[in-house]
Amino acid sequence: MFLPEAGSLVSVDHDKDSVAASKEIVKYAGLENKVHFINSTSDEAINALKESVDFIFIDHEKNRYYSDLLLMENLNLINKGGIVFADNVGIFEDKMKDYFSHVRDSGAYTSKNIGAHLEYRDNVYDAVEISKFN
């Protein structure tokens, strides 16, 4: 696993069945001491975090990307140079206007949009937005 010795990964999911399945996979991989699960909504989990982070992978309710990112910023949870990786921003572009404006135009981030096809569907355009916190 590509984490520093003292590093860990925190996964947040509101669906208890998804968390249970993920825990089994992580246990099978022998990573149960490196991966921690929070079974709650994103805003509850963000408010519960005690330490800042270097990498954030966002892939949940698309209309919450922007508000959750602002919450993390306001709580000083994103380390300088931290990466925010937002998934599925192409197919849900209409819900991403505030998010895009913030990571592209606020000056707080250096951001890049990378186009791709939706998994398992070569005929559907999608994209990810990768942003570095300045």
Question: Over which residues does each language-model region extend?
Answer:
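Conserved SAM-binding loop of SAM-dependent methyltransferases across substrates and taxa
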Residues: 1-5
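A general structural motif
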Residues: 6, 53, 79-81
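Short, conserved active-site loop motifs that form the nucleotide-linked donor/cofactor pocket
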Residues: 7, 34-36, 82, 109
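Conserved SAM-binding motif I beta-strand of class I
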Residues: 8-13
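S-adenosyl-L-methionine
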Residues: 15-52
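Short SAM/SAH-binding signature in class I
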Residues: 51-58, 83
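Switch II (G3) loop of P-loop NTPases
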Residues: 59-63
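C-terminal substrate-binding/active-site "lid" region of AdoMet-derived donor-dependent transferases
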Residues: 64-134
